[in-house]
UniProtKB/Swiss-Prot annotation:
Its main location: membrane. This is Apical membrane antigen 1-like protein. Residues 483-531 are annotated as: 12 x 4 AA approximate tandem-repeats of P-P-V-E. Residues 42-570 are extracellular. Keywords: Cell membrane, Disulfide bond, Glycoprotein, Membrane, Repeat, Secreted, Signal, Transmembrane, Transmembrane helix. Residues 1-41 form the signal peptide. Induction: Readily detected in oocysts (at protein level). Specifically up-regulated in sporozoites, but not in tachyzoites and bradyzoites. Glycans are attached at N230. Residues 483-567, 598-651 are annotated as: Disordered. The record marks A574, G575 as: Cleavage. It holds the Pfam family AMA-1. Belongs to the apicomplexan parasites AMA1 family. SMART domains: AMA-1.
Length: 651
């Protein structure tokens, strides 16, 4: 290999090594940053598994013994203190722009609406836990306004807060009573219901600060003991708090839904069945009165539900997703169910009872439940679905500008922001119909966030009067658009293209034009010229003198002069006529001579029959003067036909 080529290859190899070294250093720095970021994670972020959610976003799956699996969005990752003790900004770009994830007050308010995370169980029917082979109510948030509608005959009380039936009522079909635990303390005090004032007195100042927290703790602390075996059960029963009577109920029946003619009756039909049908409902009468919850609401901190759960509706706001610098509200296009709603209350009830809401309702029940009522409560071993809190649990109530109708749009996506809309309301299947305002922002420190310019309209999120406000402004201008500078692209070198050699163009060969065939022209019959007759001059007529010519007088002399003049004119006229006749004779002679010399066309050559029985010798025979041709040929022909005697005799 030449020395110059080896030198070029060596330089190229050296350049490649330098590039690889730079890439290696960059990779080490990236890996180091990743390790440091992992080391900064809080203890709550340990033992996590990354999965893909329904909305195709990465989410962290938290697991523990005390709570079912819940999903935590990656874009709401908790911040950790850096080496300087300051709160670090989130690493996800979308989180940097979303104030509902970056600002502490707004982020804490937004987290409570992540129902799979904060509740983790069914809402319409909550049977998300299993204990000792029994299905157990396990949600971590109270459900406001939830009641159980009984379908007993008209003579029954139809109140699910009545005492549950005992063995004394087993003969009645359907069974009377409700779901309340009828146990009694040895002191004679009823186990349920119990006044909140008594709970507050017994628990003291160290107890929960909220009535719901105290009721939940009462149910959580209950231990069922079988008196015959002294077996202690760890099964936890649900509770209901009545805010009007301020009473706490502990239910002995965990079932919340029973339907179908195979299992239950409605108003006694069909007859003979043990159970009357029942189902969960939210009614306006119970909206502010009843709160249904599991005993696990009190696990850990009995008052945590107050700040951790979506207990109320949000006024003048809609749930949405943060996209491109703005909160895009959920509407009919992103909903799973969207219909007109006449009022807000209707939308609040609809989001709780829609068929896609989070529910742990069984689909089948044991057949033995119709024969022995003790086998029914509360085991449903035939089917035991667990929703984990996932479902269509959110609804937006708003006025649709296009149709002028109020719409209730229900959706199953976890929202991550609120879009401020005057007159709108954001509901959840867990919360009450009570409306609360969005948290306040700081107008002095909040930096407006501008969304993208779409169709010449840009959405700007601002803090006006300590409240979030989204306004639209025109964003299209007419500036000079400077295209991005691109490196010049050299056109590929193409070999010169030689022009194609065209073959010589030959003129088109025209077919020979045949002359038109003219019909034979018969020669005109030439008549022999006739000699013009020359008039002989007449002698002048000499008139005798009239009488008196011999006498004198001027008169006779004048008459003589006139006569002489008239004789001269006559001679001139006669000479002119004679000259014309001579000229005509010459012309006729020339014409006759011309036709004598012209050959006859072969097609017109006279035959023997046409020439009187002889062959014509030449064209001159026609032009021979009649005095020669007629007499000579006539004589010859006469001799050949009749003989000379006949001619002589004829003439």
């Amino acid at each position: 290999m030449p020395t110059e080529s080896r030198s070029i290859l060596a330089r190229a190899e050296e350049t490649r090594c330098r590039h690889l070294s730079r890439l290696l250093r960059a990779g080490l720095v990236f890996l180091l940053c990743d390790v440091l970021t992992s080391c900064l994670a809080t203890p709550e972020l340990q033992n996590t598994v990354i999965r893909s959610s329904k909305a195709h976003h990465l989410q962290l799956l938290f697991s523990s013994r005390s709570t079912p699996a819940v999903k935590f969005p990656l874009d709401a990752t908790l911040s950790a203190p850096n080496s300087f003790g300051e709160q670090e900004a989130r690493s996800v770009e979308a989180v940097k722009q979303n104030p509902w994830a970056t600002t502490t007050a707004f982020a804490d308010f937004m987290k409570r609406f992540n129902i799979p995370q904060v509740h983790g169980s069914g809402i319409f029917v909550d049977l998300g836990r299993d204990t000792e082979g029994y299905r157990e109510v396990g949600g971590k948030c109270p459900v406001f306004g939830k009641a159980i509608q009984m379908h007993q005959p008209a003579e029954y009380s139809n109140n699910f807060l009545d005492d549950a039936p005992t063995s004394n009522d087993a003969s009645k079909k359907p069974l009377p009573g409700g779901f309340n635990n009828p146990q009694v303390y040895t002191s004679g005090q009823k186990f349920s219901p119990i006044d909140d004032s008594l709970l507050q007195e017994r628990l003291g100042t160290a107890g929960p600060k909220t009535a719901i927290g105290r009721c939940a703790l009462y149910a959580y602390s209950t231990i069922a003991v079988n008196p015959s075996t002294n077996y202690t059960s760890t099964y936890k029963y649900p509770f209901v708090y009545d805010a009007v009577s301020r009473k706490c109920y502990v239910l002995s029946v965990s079932a919340q839904l029973l339907k179908g003619e195979k299992y239950c009756s409605v108003n006694g039909t069909p007859s003979g069945l043990t159970w009357a049908c029942f189902e969960p409902v939210k009614e306006k009468s119970s909206a502010r009165a009843l709160v249904y919850g599991s005993a696990f609401v009190a696990e850990g901190n009995p008052d945590a539900w107050q700040s951790a759960c979506p207990n109320d509706a949000v006024k003048d706001a809609l749930f949405g997703k943060w996209e491109d610098g703005q909160c895009v509200p959920f509407d009919t296009k992103t909903s799973v169910q969207s219909d007109q709603a006449t009022n807000k209350e209707e939308c609040w009830k609809r989001v709780f009872a829609n068929p896609l809401v989070a529910s742990d309702a069984p689909t089948t029940y044991p057949e033995a439940a119709q024969k022995n009522w003790n086998d029914f409560w509360p085991v449903h071993e035939q089917s035991s679905p667990k929703s984990g809190g996932f479902g269509a649990n959110w609804a937006n109530f708003y006025l649709e500008k296009e149709s002028g109708e109020t719409i209730c749009a229900i959706f199953d996506q976890v929202p991550d922001c609120f879009a401020p809309i005057t007159g709108a309301v954001a509901y959840t299947a867990l919360g009450s119909s009570t409306e609360v305002n969005l948290p306040q922002c700081d107008s002095a420190s909040f930096i407006p966030i501008e969304g993208p310019c779409n169709n010449c309209v840009q959405v700007v999120t601002e803090c006006v009067g300590n409240q979030f406000d989204q306004t639209s402004k025109a964003c299209c201008t007419e500036p000079e658009i400077i295209p991005p500078v691109k490196p010049p692209v050299e056109p590929p070198v193409e070999p010169p293209v030689e022009p194609p050699v065209e073959p010589p163009v030959e003129p088109p060969v025209e077919p020979p034009v045949e002359p038109p065939v003219e019909p034979p022209v018969e020669p005109p019959v030439v008549e022999p010229p006739t000699e013009p007759s020359v008039p002989e001059p007449e002698p002048p007529v000499v008139l005798p003198p009239t009488p008196g010519e011999g006498g004198g007088g001027g008169t006779s002399g004048d008459e003589t002069v006139e006569k002489e003049g008239s004789g001269g004119n006559t001679a001139l006229i006669a000479g002119s006529v004679l000259g014309m006749l001579i000229i005509l004779a010459l012309v006729g002679t020339c014409v006759g001579f011309y036709y004598r010399k012209r050959p006859l066309p072969p097609t017109e050559r006279p035959t023997v029959e046409a020439s009187g029985g002889r062959e014509v010798e030449g064209p001159s025979d026609v032009a021979v003067p009649p005095d020669h041709s007629w007499w000579g040929e006539g004589e010859h022909e006469t001799e050949s036909l009749l003989g000379s005697r006949a001619v002589d005799a004829e003439f």
